[in-house]
């Protein structure tokens, strides 16, 4: 596994939009605030053009998204790349992505949600570690939440021991100034299949909604990844955006039968963003209806995802 070089003061952090770009006025405010926050920390920021454009849920055409990502990959001054936003259609740019150039120029890539399509593929196909974390605009909030602090510590090579947060934001809130912090809506309460759990493994995962689009395509390299790293054990971290119980059950079954979980040592599930069930299944019941036969530890409601 290749771990890109950690960033240091005066390095350039690149920002590009392989999914959607920014379109609201408050998002443009957040872009400026996030750039200022990272500059105060000692970094330069370089934005590609599509960070500030959005049409029909896309920052630009698929070939253009591939080109703008590549411009940062090949830029020797850029040492890390933070993706601008999530969305729905990142998968369109995967055929336009030069994965060989990414292999030759390993850099930290980070994002979440629809960004899973790029991050997961880079890790499983190129053997390059990626970060499932903040999109760029999240660095605009004042003061930073520990999420942003942990993120920067990791990029800088200071490996934090991440602990459960006290509260989490349970809804979407409109932003006015762009500096708004997370709302402390509910207390965090992790749950597990056992009272005390200790799991060790190589972490892999992302947004289930997106992973289900990758399975069985030419970008699905998980079986080979399992062969290379199976001896370490794969600790899967998974979260869903708007899968109901029926889609969740079918999706996990599909991944299991496709061999994705052949080297699994356990699972960490984030809190689902939007979830319902036609049959009255809780999220945990839906998950365990598929995974219980694996007899592996599972953690629910972790601080992962939307």
Residue ranges with predicted function:
Residues 1-77:
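ATP/NTP phosphate-donor binding region
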Residues 244-306:
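C-terminal active-site/capping subdomain that shapes the small-molecule cofactor and substrate pocket
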Residues 97-123, 129-137, 293-298:
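Short, acidic/small-residue loops that bind anionic groups at enzyme active sites
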Residues 131-209:
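Conserved anion/nucleotide-ligand pocket segment
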Residues 74-97:
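Long, hydrophobic/aromatic-enriched structural stretches that serve as scaffold segments
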């Amino acid at each position: 596994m290749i771990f890109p070089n950690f960033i240091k003061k005066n390095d350039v952090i690149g920002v590009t939009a392989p999914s959607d770009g920014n379109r609201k006025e408050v998002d443009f405010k957040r872009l400026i605030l996030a750039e200022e926050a990272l500059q105060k920390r000692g970094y330069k920021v370089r934005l590609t053009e599509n960070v500030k454009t959005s049409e029909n849920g896309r920052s630009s055409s698929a070939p253009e998204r591939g080109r703008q990502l590549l411009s940062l990959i090949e830029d020797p001054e850029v040492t890390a790349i933070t993706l601008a936003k999530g969305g729905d259609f990142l998968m369109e740019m995967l055929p336009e992505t030069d994965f060989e150039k990414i292999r030759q120029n390993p850099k930290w890539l980070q994002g979440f949600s629809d960004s899973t399509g790029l991050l997961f593929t880079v890790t499983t196909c190129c053997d390059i570690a990626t970060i499932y974390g903040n999109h760029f605009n999240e660095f605009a909030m004042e003061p930073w939440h520990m999420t942003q602090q942990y993120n920067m510590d990791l990029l800088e090579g200071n490996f934090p021991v991440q602990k459960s947060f006290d509260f989490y934001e349970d809804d979407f809130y409109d932003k006015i100034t762009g500096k708004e912090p997370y709302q402390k809506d509910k207390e965090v309460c992790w749950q597990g299949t056992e009272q005390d759990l200790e799991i060790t493994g190589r972490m892999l995962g992302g947004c289930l909604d997106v992973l289900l689009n990758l399975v069985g395509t030419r970008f699905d390299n998980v079986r080979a990844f399992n062969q290379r790293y199976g001896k370490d054990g794969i600790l899967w971290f998974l979260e869903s955006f708007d899968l109901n119980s029926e889609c969740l059950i079918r999706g996990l079954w599909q991944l299991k039968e496709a061999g994705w979980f052949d080297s699994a040592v356990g699972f960490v599930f984030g809190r689902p963003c939007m979830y319902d069930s036609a049959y009255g299944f809780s999220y945990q019941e839906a998950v365990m209806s598929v995974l219980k036969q694996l007899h592996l530890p599972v953690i629910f409601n972790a601080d992962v995802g939307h």
